[in-house]
Amino acid sequence: MTNYQLQIKRFVFGPFETNCYVISTDDRILLVDPACSNDYEQRELENYISNLQSSISNIQLSIVATHGHLDHLWGAAWATSRWNTPVLMHEADIPMAQAMQSQYNLFGIRRQPEPFPIENIKSKILNLKSKMSNFELLETPGHTPGSVCLYFPFANNHSPFVITGDTLFHRGYGRTDLPGGNIGQLIDSLERLFTLPADTIVYPGHGDFTTIGAERR
């Protein structure tokens, strides 16, 4: 495999302080969990991505969701319209994301959700890997049925890292008391994550980064 330059940028967006990540290489941008919840946050994200696009010709952008919860998708309708591309997520969480009003009602949020295009990430994985060859999709159900982690085992300027959504946090893990949660599945998913190299950096859906080695101790 050929190594390449990689950048990762974290934004903290919305009332749930959700981490949104932008991963960029020479010709691909992955926008992970478009959590921007207002105009200011949208402009902040747009300006950063526009700067990347202006410095690299023909760069392609994909939007990926680690799971279908509302706090990770506040800005999905805006982002899919802005960059004319769907949100890619695991098929098991698509019904949840399409029933966003139910999630709003569950949390008492008085807001009208906007629909946005969604596609099954597993049907697009070969296309993603063609531009980001070391990207691996890890299926990690438990917090939700379709939770996924994005694992990058190498890049010549960055340690291995994994974006874990709400599966694994610094000194914690995702709740399973929401619809679709399953503690047994979550434990299995955590055990699989703990088989990754100890120096793998964990970029979670909320809070600060950690490492696999620190969390499995």
Feature names for model-found ranges:
Residues 22, 128-155:
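Core dinuclear metal-dependent hydrolase active-site scaffold
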Residues 151-153, 159-161, 185-217:
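Divalent-metal (often Zn2+) His-rich catalytic cores of metallo-beta-lactamase-fold enzymes
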